[in-house]
Amino acid sequence: MKVNFINFSDPKDHKCFLITGGELILKHEVVEIILDKLKSAGFNEKVSISQDELERMQEIASRNMGGSLFQENLILHIKHTSGKFPEKIKLFLENAEIFNSPNIALIVESSIEKTPASGTWIKNFDANGLIINCSKLKIMEEKIWLKRQLNFLPKDLLPIFGSSIIQNNESNL
């Protein structure tokens, strides 16, 4: 399933997430929400894999899917920061077993702006996970996002501070 950042609020029962787009602050916010939800679901250990360490990805997943006595609920956080979407990640995601493993949660954070329409890996993700687009917000979406960020303010001060921030920082999160 695909959603835009502004429509994302709760990961619900998903365990696999693909986060795309170029707005780093939005991606960071989404990752924090997802990690909190997964931790409350019993996923306590997190392994981060950068673009340079993709060889480890399959080994870590296999070790946790193999039915080991000591397997844990693991969050596998894969970070793709630049360039085309790596073939190693595509091949990894083409294996549907990763989406069905009860003790692996998957967060793929990617710099790609748009997800491809076809390909086994994207079809697997669309069917079994949640694809969250964190691209640049429109003006109205920025206002909604800012209102959520300022929810600690009293209702009477929100319009004053909110409009001032929007005027000074329009189109610049």
Question: Where in this protein do the model-derived segments appear?
Answer:
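Non-catalytic interfacial helical region
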Residues: 2-17, 22-173
